[in-house]
Amino acid sequence: IMSEEQITPNNGSYSADSIQVLEGLEAVRKRPAMYIGDISVKGLHHLVYEIVDNSIDEALAGYCDHIEVTINEDNSITVQDNGRGIPVDYHEKEKKSALEVAMTVLHAGGKFDKGSYKVSGGLHGVGMSCVNALSTHMTTQVFRDGKIYQQEYEIGKPLYSVKEVGVSDITGTRQQFWPDDTIFTETVYDYKILASRLRELAYLNAGLRISLTDRRVVNEEDGSFKSEVFYSEEGLREFVRFIESSREHLINDVIYLNSEKQGIPIEIAIMYNTGFSENVHSYVNNINTIEGGTHLAGFRRALTRTLKKYAEDSKMLEKVKVEISGDDFREGLTAVISVKVAEPQFEGQTKTKLGNNEVMGAVDQAVGEVLAYYLEEHPKEAKTIVDKVILAATARHAARKAREMVQRKSPMSGGGLPGKLADCSDKDPSKCELFLVEGDSAGGTAKQGRNRMFQAILPLRGKILNVEKAMYHKALESDEIRNIYTALGVTIGTEDDSKEANIEKLRYHKIIIMTDADVDGSHIDTLIMTFFFRYMPQIIQNGYLYIATPPLYLCKKGKVEEYCWTDAQRQKFIDTYGGGLENAVHTQRYKGLGEMNAQQLWETTMDPDNRMLKQVNIDNAAEADYIFSMLMGEDVGPRREFIEENATYANIDT
């Protein structure tokens, strides 16, 4: 079911007058993290998204349908689109070409002038000038009015005025930039990270073709470069099917709406599966609003109201003995919500929560209309959904006891901490660390080796429950999972959602998974990460979850001892101290944490000055949702396919 409205090209003119100027560029180089998030992998890739966002603005306005992104041999990036081309005419106020203004002045651009773009993507709207400021070199070519115009820059400063360099029968913009290695700690682009975001953008913008080419990787057979094309004719409908592809569907239909209410374009796709979790991915102007906001609230309100009214009118709830709550309508629900807002207000800890109040009513109205129509037209599917809601309510009723067990042991009630927890003496969460350690024996060593001031230890017995396959109340009945909630000081239930984790009284801002460096250890890591992703995603979003990396080897030659985390480090030790002869060096392979004594464990894995921690991040929540359900869910087929495809990369420990 769907209701559709077409995008019509916006009639606003896009010329020098549309480019507005707000402030200078030096600030970007002084505090880059303020503008692009950080100066490592995330920020490096964010540069590409800023340029791509400009091309997508052209697509949203109806003028561009193809964007090409290329990672060049030297790790520079080229982005080309077939939009109208950035204006090059004279900018009255700034007394220079509009292109130069857009490239060299922060907060200059068509997105600040409502006439040229009704809505525009890009989180900060700092756009091209910000990328320019953070690049050692940048070249911009504009194809417009039958001509090619060009300007080059170094660290944001033009090398010459905009000049005409040729004729052209196409329109569009081509940008190439070289990220500045004096600012970025990482300057090598990761194909997978870019592919993941570009795939997401293709789903969010139906009919837009986005290609990604990696000129660093050549196919030996035909000499071509590694490349992919992302294109989705059906947009969100395909997106929600992609996320759901490894789950069992409750109904085969995608409930779809594409309409405009109160001047806000709204597109939503909904599917139901037989699972127990709610997975709603929401976007504003193509930005993933991880913390939700008014669009999500409007969606939930309409879903609950419409389904409840239909069930009551159809007399389906007459024999139900338990009370039905809003959460019950969302169990097994997967949805993607995409709204376009002219002036979005972002709130929350990571500035990814939509605050515009007018959006709530608009989404509520749109969803209410389309869902009511769908339920009336599809009574069989409607009954299946309502039956699932009743099942969820009954299970939730059974889960109340389990939830109360978690709640009752809240840290505020005093003496409610799990007996196995060896707590630290400092009470400032920002300084405290909790190690989740596999097994009692390793837990004992960790307790002896830690710094008691700020490091706490919680030993976990065996493998924790795979929450991907378990009903909600079963997960909460598991002792190990209850102990994690209690030790962390996390309770269940917030104002918005009775199932959501409440981390206001979180006791540690570093939660470190510490397991053996073998296959079993990796499996336990994955089970714990699955738990946090599904039950406490805020922990990952805030950057609180880490994985410890114990060394694989201890190499000795005479009096020289060195811990090695990789085979390459071990080989280097052999080359340096053993003349390249493996037999000349004594190597101890650590299979488990228990093989180290307390002092060794502290030196290698727990001491903040020497250890290596991997921070767990989610670059793309929708893709992570798909991967967790595929790797950890009930359906074996997609998992086997994934393993066969990736077997060459697998590190199999025998």
PLM regions and their residue ranges:
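Conserved short strand/loop->alpha-helix "switch" segment adjacent to the catalytic nucleotide/phosphoryl-transfer site
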Residues: K30-Y49
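Helical (often loop-to-helix) elements that flank the catalytic cores of nucleotide-handling enzymes
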Residues: E92, E347-M360, Y563-Q569, F573-I574
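A short glycine-centered beta->alpha linker in the GHKL/HATPase_c
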Residues: G85-Y90
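Short adenine-binding "F-helix/F-box" segment of the Bergerat
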Residues: H91-E92, L99
